[in-house]
């Protein structure tokens, strides 16, 4: 299969895709935290998980319907790609117009961020080896290019 390396990393949850349904349910002033904080939220089991399971994510790539969105943008601060939350609000508007996108790759939330413990660093390294496949997948993904927020221009 064309995207087999990507499917393996998703199945193993080295990369965890964000569930669009969860993203759209977030209030307007919500800010996307690091993956580590989202996993704590997931373990608290307060309803809909922010993440797809590894099997759910792999199935979206395998079905060839381009249901995974991959964000492309520059980080506004070295430690925070979206300090004002403006990118999340823009992404929510885009996703409402593109109901076929079921999951999102957003590096801040889907890859482990510093500081990382050893197992997180190992997962991050494996994810980096195939991360560009998310942007280059001919079958599984759609790229979403977010502009620089007005307040930062």
Predicted region positions:
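The feature represents the membrane-entry module of six-transmembrane cation channels
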Residues: 1-153
